[in-house]
Amino acid sequence: MNSVKELNVKEMKQLHGGVNYGNGVSCSKTKCSVNWGQAFQERYTAGINSFVSGVASGAGSIGRRP
């Protein structure tokens, strides 16, 4: 188990870190990188959710005759 130290405001101001956008892309001060596994999974999941939402709302019947 890792030990965790709670930082005060002064200590937090001294930290220099990057940004993780939550979709597989993360950037530091000098470069950005992509975790392709996470990026693909995020995009795949969004596509499936969009498809299912469209079918559930009746968009799947557009262009079909009753």
Curated annotation (Swiss-Prot):
Q: Is Transferase one of the keywords UniProt gives this record?
A: no
- What are the UniProt keywords, alphabetically? Antibiotic, Antimicrobial, Bacteriocin, Disulfide bond, Plasmid, Secreted
Q: Propeptide residues, per UniProt?
A: 1-18
Location in the cell: Secreted
CC per GO annotation: extracellular region
Any one of the GO BP annotations = defense response to bacterium
Lineage: superkingdom = Bacteria
Disulphide bridges in this chain? 27-32
Could you list the residue ranges forming a coiled coil in this record?
none
**Physiological role:** Has antibacterial activity against Listeria and Enterococcus.
Regarding protein family, the annotation reads: Belongs to the bacteriocin class IIA/YGNGV family.
Its name, as the record gives it, is Bacteriocin carnobacteriocin B2
> What organism is recorded for this protein?
Carnobacterium maltaromaticum
